[in-house]
Amino acid sequence: MKPTVWHHLRLCPHGHPDETIDDAAIAVDETGAIVWLGACAALPHGYAHWRREDLHGAWVTPGLVDCHTHLVYGGTRADEFAQRLAGVSYEEIARQGGGIVSTVRATRAADETALFVQAAARLQPLLAEGVTAIEIKSGYGLDLASERKMLRVARQLGERFPVSVYTTFLGAHALPPEYAGRADAYIDEICERMLPTLADEGLIDAVDVFCERIGFSLAQTERVFEAATRRGLPVKLHAEQLSDAGGTALAARYHALSADHLEFLDEAGIEAMKAAGTVAVLLPGAYYFIRETQLPPIDLLRRHGVPIALATDHNPGTSPLESLLLTMNLGCTLFRMTVPEVLQGVTRHAAAALGRADRHGALEVGRQADFAVWSVGSLAELAYWIGRPLCEQVVRGGTTVFRRMIG
């Protein structure tokens, strides 16, 4: 690429609407790295002959980060939607053989090509909203071959689309049918065979567990965390979504990158997260879709200074959501979060939830130039509009990878 100065823009370099630069410029060298940013009036003369791109006063933020998704899977669960509307609970559907296990059947039956095509269709709307980094979990295979297949597809998405993909092994998502009544034996399989094999194949960036009364116990979760730690892999946790199981305190003991959901999180768990530097990832799409009533303890998280991230939690059963902007709106309207909180929640704090705060979530000299250009009058509009296409352009490594066609 040619060295380029992007100029006449309004810059929000760290995802906070109160920390902005009017009439700003960003200089990006031939490697795609930011070499200078600041007010246009202060642009050094050495950049005078670089290629220019005039953004005509548009807002620029760091590329968005979706830090919790289950993007790769087979089929849908639209039939369960009708059951939920009739009053059947998430837990009851799972006990009937639906829920996660029904998606496991569809995912096992699909080949890599089919999974890639389906996941690519889910990824593209996120890219068109300014997402430049995304986490993708496994967890719908629940055997070595199928988990490998999911993680390989996730890696392929990162190779073939202009987005940084981080993979999370979620083998401990549910109990596969062949292990019915033998949860400890399945944890043996995860710890002794699946996790080591997939780690050796370079398919895992982090390890997650669904710690819940319909998932895995604290003791089983700790076994998976121990296996991950032996491999030098960071951990994260689905925690306190349906009950206060104490998973967050366990996650904090292992210095987890994040604990996610957290509707039933108590103050002791919050204190443990703060001490460990664990990010709280809230998932308002799932809260909305399954009509939860227990709000996450937002005020306590604020009071203790725990960083809060937001994510789509895209999955077929509880959050078939393909919009991080709508997630921001739900964070404001359902969780009573502020605009600065939700914007940092999909930039700086989301990057921290992936352990990648040094690479994503902010625009600084020396970093890769990943940013989104917005056709809005104020940054509050990113969380205000519902369904309006707001992203004009997405730049990754200094190259425009998406441009919205107008007219």
From Swiss-Prot:
Pathway named in the protein's UniProt entry: Amino-acid degradation; L-histidine degradation into L-glutamate; N-formimidoyl-L-glutamate from L-histidine: step 3/3
Compartments reported by the entry: Cytoplasm
Reactions this protein catalyses: 4-imidazolone-5-propanoate + H2O = N-formimidoyl-L-glutamate
Gene3D superfamilies for the chain: Metal-dependent hydrolases, Urease, subunit C, domain 1
Residue numbers binding 4-imidazolone-5-propanoate: 77, 140, 173, 241, 318
Annotated Gene Ontology cellular component terms: cytoplasm
Keywords attached to this entry: Cytoplasm, Histidine metabolism, Hydrolase, Iron, Metal-binding, Zinc
Source organism, top-level taxon: Bacteria
Cited InterPro entries: Amidohydro-rel, HutI, Metal-dep_hydrolase_composite, Metal_Hydrolase
Binding site for Fe(3+): 68, 70, 238, 313
Listed GO MF terms: imidazolonepropionase activity; iron ion binding; zinc ion binding
Cofactor: how bound: Binds 1 zinc or iron ion per subunit.
EC assignment: 3.5.2.7
Residue numbers binding N-formimidoyl-L-glutamate: 140, 315, 317
Enzyme's top EC category: hydrolase
Chief location bin: cytoplasm
Pfam families membership: Amidohydro_1
A biological process term (GO) from this entry: L-histidine catabolic process to glutamate and formate
Entries under NCBIfam families matching the protein: hutI (TIGR01224)
Function noted in UniProt: Catalyzes the hydrolytic cleavage of the carbon-nitrogen bond in imidazolone-5-propanoate to yield N-formimidoyl-L-glutamate. It is the third step in the universal histidine degradation pathway.
Similarity comment text for this entry: Belongs to the metallo-dependent hydrolases superfamily. HutI family.
Protein name (database record): Imidazolonepropionase
Organism: Burkholderia multivorans (strain ATCC 17616 / 249)
Gene name for this UniProt entry: hutI
